[in-house]
């Protein structure tokens, strides 16, 4: 009986124009629902999986309203920046901090392309997993930043409780508990690696990663495992390794319940459920779920033969 009603509102009955939220072609609606409500809907047995026509219209309206809010606040921010650009009195900073906003420009957008603004927002939410907080603090240590001294940026304040504040990436829904961690994440989207090694061509997303990399050149390994004799160039490297001793697996797959030691391994696991094939070989017109599979393919005889055919 439940399967004939809408998953979102729970009231309207599904019809021919209702959408199956868990079809691959409709996954953008799950993303939009998460963007608006913060909820991650999961396909469950005996639970509706369709969204009714009314909720589709409500969702479009909510997305349009969100876009309008962002556009308007960007305009006010521009006016505020222009009016305060010539003011050198630092005592006025308290007024600016009363309404902080931050928006990221990702460069010129192609015509016809869906433009989706990205901004940082602080919201009230249940306390984050202690392990996630620990990982965020570890990243701060790697960056050499005191958590209490993180420089303030212009951010939309929705909550005044520091412990409840998180940063949300509006491109992918990722949550971060510290500003440096969020900034590092956004550099991934922009393709920025501003921290370059002086000894080689490697570039990194954060100063902490650069510092850890530099230890590869110096041979320094200051972070010793508390359970064995292994040593590591970074705090995070040691933390991840020690989970093999403690069997701590804080990253849980919402689809099947499997647990993993790092977010990276969980992300790789998720492609099994989503069926995404983001790594493509244009020469052979084939797509793969993992980068490693694509690399293996490029070494295959079939790929090499296709490369020769294309050159001839």
Swiss-Prot record:
GO cellular component: a single term: nucleus
Protein name (database record): Transcription factor Ouib
Protein's cellular compartments: Nucleus
Positions contributing to Zn(2+) binding: 6, 9, 52, 55
Zinc finger (C2H2-type) stretch: 167-189, 195-217, 223-245, 251-273, 279-303
Pfam families (alphabetical): zf-AD, zf-C2H2, zf-met
Tissue distribution of the protein: Expressed predominantly in the prothoracic gland during embryonic and larval development.
GO molecular function: DNA-binding transcription factor activity; DNA-binding transcription factor activity, RNA polymerase II-specific; RNA polymerase II cis-regulatory region sequence-specific DNA binding; zinc ion binding
Domain ZAD: 4-79
UniProt entry tagged with the keyword Transit peptide: no
Chief location category: nucleus
GO biological process, one term: instar larval development
């Amino acid at each position: 009986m439940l399967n004939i009603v809408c998953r979102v509102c729970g009231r309207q009955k599904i019809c021919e124009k209702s959408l199956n939220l868990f079809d691959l072609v409709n996954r953008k609606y799950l993303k939009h629902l998460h963007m608006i409500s913060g909820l991650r809907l999961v396909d469950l047995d005996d639970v509706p999986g369709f969204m009714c026509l009314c909720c589709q219209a409500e969702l479009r309206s909510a997305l349009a309203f969100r876009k309008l809010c962002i556009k308007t606040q960007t305009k006010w921010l521009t006016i505020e920046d222009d009016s305060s650009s010539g003011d050198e009195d630092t005592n006025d900073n308290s007024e600016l901090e009363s309404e902080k906003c931050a928006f990221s420009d990702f460069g010129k957008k192609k015509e016809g392309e869906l433009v989706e603004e990205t901004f940082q927002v602080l919201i009230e939410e249940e306390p984050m997993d202690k392990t996630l907080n620990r990982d965020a603090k570890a990243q701060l240590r790697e960056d050499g930043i005191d958590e209490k001294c993180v420089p303030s940026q212009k951010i939309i304040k929705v909550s005044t409780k520091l412990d409840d504040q998180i940063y949300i990436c509006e491109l992918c829904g990722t949550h971060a508990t510290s500003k440096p961690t969020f900034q590092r994440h956004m550099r991934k989207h922009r393709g920025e690696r501003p921290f370059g090694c002086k000894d080689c061509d490697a570039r990194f997303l954060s100063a902490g990663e650069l510092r850890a990399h530099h230890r590869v050149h110096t041979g320094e390994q200051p972070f010793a495992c508390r359970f064995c004799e292994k040593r590591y160039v970074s705090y995070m490297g040691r933390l991840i390794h020690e989970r093999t001793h403690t069997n701590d697996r804080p990253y849980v797959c919402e689809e099947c319940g499997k647990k993993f030691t790092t977010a990276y391994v969980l992300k790789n696991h998720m492609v099994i459920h989503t069926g995404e094939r983001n790594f493509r070989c244009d020469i052979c017109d084939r797509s793969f779920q993992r980068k490693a599979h694509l690399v293996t393919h490029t070494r295959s005889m079939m790929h090499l033969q296709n490369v020769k055919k294309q050159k001839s």
